[in-house]
């Protein structure tokens, strides 16, 4: 049985003071919540500090990116082994901001997926369409292409224990969000697409929604059968708002 996962992507935000303050508040807000996995992905600079601040809690440590190389002359990069060594578990790859600003391709992201699996880390594979692609009716085509980059090189088995985050690009940081019915339709398509190769893996893979999820719209989104939590951006920087989202995910899946 799938359990939801709510993960906070802090993006390029944080300070030593903020890390301690936010994690302390999260620990307090979420101390009695169960039935929902929780993870946060601070900037890499603060991973070690966050690890110590999270010690003894049920909140997992994540990261926002990884390089395909394990070591060597690759200035500014961070390897899977380094992330594992510092205690990170959930690693975001393929985020639309990486695809857009750093020109990351489907093939490069699939390679990162493989590197993470080999290292025993959990890939959080972000997929999703632009506003233009959505308007052109290409949502399923785009999502299938991005998933196929992994399926065709590593097989459906690679998604065992992995996480997919559907993040319609037109709904990221815009205040827009897919309706629960729209999001559910795409999540079902993603699951069905993987099921063509392996129904058992498809049934178990966690598929998060990641388009402007906040404390106001989360509960309704989580009532949908194929939405397994959320990848949260801005709202993850506010302990009270993030806690509402986590509690909504836990409550929805218990219902």
UniProtKB/Swiss-Prot annotation:
Compartments, as annotated in UniProt: Cytoplasm
- Its EC number(s): 5.3.1.1
GO molecular function terms attached to this record: triose-phosphate isomerase activity
Record-annotated residues binding substrate?
Answer: 9-11, 173, 212, 233-234
According to its UniProt record, which residues of this chain constitute the active site? 95, 167
Q: What does the entry list under GO cellular component?
A: cytosol
| Main location per the UniProt record | cytoplasm
What is the top-level taxon of the source organism?
A: Bacteria
Q: PROSITE patterns this protein is in?
A: TIM_1, TIM_2
CDD domains xrefs: TIM
Q: Which UniProt keywords apply?
A: Cytoplasm, Gluconeogenesis, Glycolysis, Isomerase
Q: In which pathway does it act?
A: Carbohydrate biosynthesis; gluconeogenesis; Carbohydrate degradation; glycolysis; D-glyceraldehyde 3-phosphate from glycerone phosphate: step 1/1
Catalytically driven reaction(s): D-glyceraldehyde 3-phosphate = dihydroxyacetone phosphate
Q: What GO terms describe the biological role, i.e. biological process, of this protein?
A: gluconeogenesis; glyceraldehyde-3-phosphate biosynthetic process; glycerol catabolic process; glycolytic process
Q: Which family does it belong to?
A: Belongs to the triosephosphate isomerase family.
- Subunit structure, interactors included: Homodimer.
Q: What does this protein do?
A: Involved in the gluconeogenesis. Catalyzes stereospecifically the conversion of dihydroxyacetone phosphate (DHAP) to D-glyceraldehyde-3-phosphate (G3P).
Identify this protein by name: Triosephosphate isomerase
Primary gene name: tpiA
């Amino acid at each position: 049985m799938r359990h939801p996962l709510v993960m906070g992507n802090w993006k390029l935000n944080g300070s030593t003071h903020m890390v301690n303050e936010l994690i302390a508040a999260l620990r307090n807000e979420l101390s009695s919540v169960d039935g929902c996995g929780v993870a946060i992905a601070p900037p890499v600079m603060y991973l070690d500090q966050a690890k110590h601040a999270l010690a003894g809690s049920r909140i997992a440590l994540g990261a926002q990116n990884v390089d395909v190389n394990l070591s060597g002359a690759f200035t500014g990069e961070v390897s899977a082994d380094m992330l594992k060594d510092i205690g990170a578990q959930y690693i975001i790859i393929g985020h639309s901001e990486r695809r857009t600003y750093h020109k990351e391709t489907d093939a490069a992201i699939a390679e990162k997926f493989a590197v993470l699996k080999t290292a025993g880390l959990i890939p959080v594979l972000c997929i999703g369409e632009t506003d233009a692609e959505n308007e052109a009716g290409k949502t399923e085509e785009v999502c299938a292409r991005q998933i196929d980059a992994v399926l065709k090189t590593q097989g459906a088995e690679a998604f065992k224990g992995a996480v997919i985050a559907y993040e319609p690009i037109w709904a990221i940081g815009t205040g827009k969000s897919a309706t629960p019915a729209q999001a559910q339709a795409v999540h079902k398509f993603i699951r069905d697409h993987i099921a063509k190769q392996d129904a058992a893996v498809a049934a178990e893979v966690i598929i998060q929604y990641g388009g402007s999820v906040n404390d106001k719209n989360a509960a309704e989104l989580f009532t949908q059968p194929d939405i397994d939590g959320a990848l949260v951006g801005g709202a993850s920087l506010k302990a009270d708002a993030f806690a509402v989202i986590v509690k909504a995910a836990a409550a929805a899946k218990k219902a």
